[in-house]
């Protein structure tokens, strides 16, 4: 049942055994949790057979944020053609699919409904098992598809995206333990709101970019990257929770003060926006590093030993893992503890169908009998969803005092 638990160094193919190495299985993944329509096919060796992604970013950027009913309409308009294109690219017949995996939780309910209804229809028509997928679990496990020899269970994962910020220990699909989570905003959400308030979208090069990408690029233009410094959130709380509302509000105040000093017009951007973005990135990096550092130390406690017998491993995933400056700092932090660090390829950090298909593969690997479900109508959506276990209280009770590792820049 737990063939993958001690799998580091063995490779995916070895876990399956000779019989399955001769006959590949294909899992179709469907992702519609927010504003991306993703459909992909992954085989049981982790090879991506086809990957189709329809982004709604350009539409929602024009309106300053995601509009759930319009996101649902766009998913409905695109999902059938995305599926057809995926099957054509894979050069497979529908009956060659082994199973269909679909995001059921968490996410925007209106968006989730489109994917789940389409998946039910497809599974029923093809008489294939339907595998429900936890969206954040899929982010956490994605790097294993690309690094099967290096990432074994258990491992620590920092999940940072537009809707979430969590620290979890992964032991397998459906077997994640929460160590800490954001108490308010997620980092990607904060980047988007700060980017809009800074009015980076006025600049032609950032017109169609999300806030995080624009801020990362603008930070590279800084002449004085230490010009802005923001208070560290939750500095007195010895747990692994996050808070980005303070950084966001302090950013708004700093922008407003600079605009007043420069008399920036309503359609203008402060002159030292590069310095501001560099300071913002450093502050977010410090906060992520501090909470992750405590999580590493908690995992290494003699009476916990949450890494088990595997080499200590830290994975960062989610849309914010695309940010090279932030990931470099997380990588730097991990190295101080002799901890290996990984992230998915950039094309797989943000939402996509590949990670959903791969989670389906992981479910089948862990327990094929339990994962093979034909009770289609009982598989439904959940707008919010937690994990199997939580150590949040235990982390706080441990009250670990850390000697902080400083960011690279």
Swiss-Prot record:
UniProt keyword annotations, A-Z: Acyltransferase, Metal-binding, Mitochondrion, Transferase, Transit peptide, tRNA processing
**Which Pfam families does the protein's record reference?**
TsaD (PF00814)
Q: Can the keyword Manganese be found in this entry's annotation?
A: no
InterPro entries associated with the record: ATPase_NBD, Gcp-like_dom, KAE1/TsaD, TsaD
Q: Which GO terms describe its biological process?
A: mitochondrial tRNA threonylcarbamoyladenosine modification
**Catalysed reactions, semicolon-separated:** L-threonylcarbamoyladenylate + adenosine(37) in tRNA = N(6)-L-threonylcarbamoyladenosine(37) in tRNA + AMP + H(+)
Annotated transit peptide: 1-31
* Residues that coordinate or bind a divalent metal cation: 135, 139, 351
- GO molecular function terms noted in the UniProt entry: metal ion binding; N(6)-L-threonylcarbamoyladenine synthase activity
What's the domain of life for this entry? Answer: Eukaryota
Tell me which residues bind substrate: 159-163, 192, 212, 216, 322-323, 350
Reply yes or no: does the keyword Mitochondrion apply. yes
Task: Say which enzyme class the record assigns.
Answer: transferase
Which cofactors does the annotated protein need, by name?
Answer: a divalent metal cation
**What does the entry's cofactor note say about binding and number?**
Binds 1 divalent metal cation per subunit.
**GO cellular component terms, semicolon-separated:** mitochondrial matrix; mitochondrion
* Compartment(s): Mitochondrion
Question: Sorted alphabetically, which Gene3D superfamilies does this protein's record hold?
Answer: 3.30.420.40
Q: How does it assemble?
A: Homodimer.
The task this protein performs is described as: Required for the formation of a threonylcarbamoyl group on adenosine at position 37 (t(6)A37) in mitochondrial tRNAs that read codons beginning with adenine. Probably involved in the transfer of the threonylcarbamoyl moiety of threonylcarbamoyl-AMP (TC-AMP) to the N6 group of A37. Involved in mitochondrial genome maintenance.
* Annotated family: Belongs to the KAE1 / TsaD family.
Matching entries from HAMAP family are given as: TsaD (MF_01445)
Name under which the protein is recorded: Probable tRNA N6-adenosine threonylcarbamoyltransferase, mitochondrial
| Originating species | Drosophila melanogaster (Fruit fly)
Q: Name the lineage.
A: Eukaryota, Metazoa, Ecdysozoa, Arthropoda, Hexapoda
């Amino acid at each position: 049942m737990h063939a993958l638990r001690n799998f580091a160094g063995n490779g995916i193919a070895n876990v399956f055994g000779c019989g399955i190495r001769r006959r590949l299985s294909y899992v179709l993944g469907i992702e519609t949790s927010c504003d991306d329509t993703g459909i992909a096919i992954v085989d049981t060796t982790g090879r991506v057979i086809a990957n189709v992604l329809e982004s709604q970013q350009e539409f929602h950027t024009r309106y300053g944020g995601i509009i759930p009913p319009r996101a649902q309409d766009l998913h409905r308009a695109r999902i059938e053609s995305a599926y057809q294109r995926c099957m054509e690219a894979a050069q497979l017949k529908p009956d060659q699919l082994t199973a269909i995996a679909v995001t059921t939780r968490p996410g925007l309910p209106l968006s989730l409904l489109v994917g789940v209804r389409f998946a039910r229809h497809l599974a029923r028509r093809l008489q294939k098992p339907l595998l429900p997928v936890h969206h954040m679990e899929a982010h956490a496990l994605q790097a294993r598809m690309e690094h099967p020899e290096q990432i074994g269970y258990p491992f620590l994962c920092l999940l940072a995206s537009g809707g979430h910020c969590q620290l979890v220990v992964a032991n397998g699909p459906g077997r994640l333990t929460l160590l800490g989570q954001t108490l308010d905003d997620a980092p990607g959400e904060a980047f988007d709101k700060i980017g809009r308030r800074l009015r980076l979208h006025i600049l032609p090069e950032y017109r169609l970019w999300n806030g995080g990408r624009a801020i990362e690029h603008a930070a590279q233009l800084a002449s004085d990257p230490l010009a802005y410094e923001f208070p560290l959130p939750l500095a007195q709380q010895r747990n692994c929770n996050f808070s980005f509302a303070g950084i966001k509000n302090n950013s708004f105040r700093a922008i407003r003060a600079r605009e007043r000093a420069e008399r920036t017009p309503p359609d203008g951007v402060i002159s030292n926006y590069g310095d501001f973005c560099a300071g913002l990135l450093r502050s977010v990096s410090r906060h992520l590093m501090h909470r992750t550092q405590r999580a590493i130390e908690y995992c290494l406690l003699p009476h916990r030993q949450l890494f088990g017998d595997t080499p200590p491993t830290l994975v960062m995933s989610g849309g914010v893992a695309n940010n090279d400056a932030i990931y470099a700092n997380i990588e730097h932090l991990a190295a101080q503890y002799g901890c290996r660090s990984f992230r998915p390829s950039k094309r797989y950090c943000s939402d996509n169908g590949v990670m959903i298909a791969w989670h389906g593969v992981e479910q089948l690997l862990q327990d094929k009998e339990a994962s093979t479900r034909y009770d289609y109508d009982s598989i439904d959506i959940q707008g919010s969803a937690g994990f199997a276990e939580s150590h949040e209280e235990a982390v706080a009770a441990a009250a670990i005092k850390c000697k902080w590792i400083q960011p690279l820049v």
